[in-house]
Amino acid sequence: MENFFNNILETGSIIASPSKDPDYNFHWVRDSAIVMKSVITLFEKERKNQKYMKIIENYIKTECEHINFHPAEPKFLLDKTPYLGDWGRPQNDGPALRGIVCLKLLKVYGRKQKDLLKIIFNDLSYTIEQLEEPCFDLWEEEYGYHLYTRMVQYKFLCECLYSDKVQYEDLNERIVNRSRELLGHHFSGDNIYSSYDIHGQILRECDSSVLLGLSHVDYKLDEFDCFSDNIKNYAYKMISVFTDIYPINKKLNIPFLGRYFNDKYFDGNPWIISTIALYQYSFVCPNFYYNKNEFKNFLKFLYDDKKLLLSEQIHRETGEDVSVEKLTWNYSELITLFKFIKNFQIDNLIDLFVTE
């Protein structure tokens, strides 16, 4: 876990990766919230662990500074000022994810309540205001309406409405119900549309952001069924589509997933976070695909690299590392995966990931 904690700086910034080529040495609001979600998982197991407490304190302090800028600013420099270059803005999943994490800290941490509420109210106000507006997706490429963004927004609004610690007069059941209706715009019969543009044109097929979104809301979206047949079928379709285009899948007998079908970034290779999201879903969803041998192959593939550098992508033919290494988001999703595993003989593997 040294690589994971090295990316969480004492200043409170959480870098996406130490890589400078391409340059991921920034604090993304989205990525940092996802990372903090896994830190909270570790903290709940060891509530007296000073390292986890310090990380939490630093994160709260840093986000209190970040909210002085535009709420949907996607990434920050390490001096805690926004990155001002050309980028996909706004990214409305960031405030919702940060709000979800701060709500969780409000429940389990017991300190910095005033600062946490300051962040929550900032993100809640923005989420309500922008609920029906288009934005860029979590892959930072397409402008429109996105299922992932709407899942985390709905989760955030629900949790705020039903929290006895959050009293916000502009939030009511009508807004939460509207948020749920907007989720429904991404489903038509057996079809799931992860993203569509402002003209209603479908932007993506076989998008792993759907599985990541389910994980990031803990598979709990009020009355929304995270384990419906159409979501399971969507996941099965992704396995089939990516196995057809990635030779490495058949070579290693591992169902690697990419970000989405026809991805062009670094030639569209398998992504570690996408594949982990599939296995997370496998462990929590009743009667869904799970192949024990394939899962062991996946763990072996990760552990063959004793330094656990965990690159963002792997080459679709050779399995070699592609793009940045030591992607913080990778380690975070692994911690979440191991949280979901039950009755599986990998205690030694879990210990390796969650201890130094």
Briefly describe each language-model feature range.
Residues 41-60, 104-121, 160-177, 218-236, ...:
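Structural helix-adjacent loops and short alpha-helical linkers that scaffold large soluble proteins
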Residues 68-138:
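Active-site lining segments of carbohydrate-active enzymes
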Residues 12-21, 74-89, 128-144, 185-196, ...:
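Acidic/His metal-coordination segments adjacent to aromatic residues that form catalytic metal sites
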Residues 114-182:
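Aromatic- and glycine-enriched pocket-lining scaffold segments that form the walls
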Residues 1-30, 57-58, 62-73:
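Low-complexity, Ser/Thr/Pro/Gly-enriched N-terminal "stalk/linker" regions
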Residues 29-89:
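Membrane helical hairpin/interfacial module
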Residues 29, 65-84, 147-154, 166-276:
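Extended ligand-binding clefts on enzyme/binding-domain cores
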Residues 75, 83-102, 202-223, 270-356:
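C-terminal capping/lid segments that line or modulate ligand- or cofactor-binding pockets
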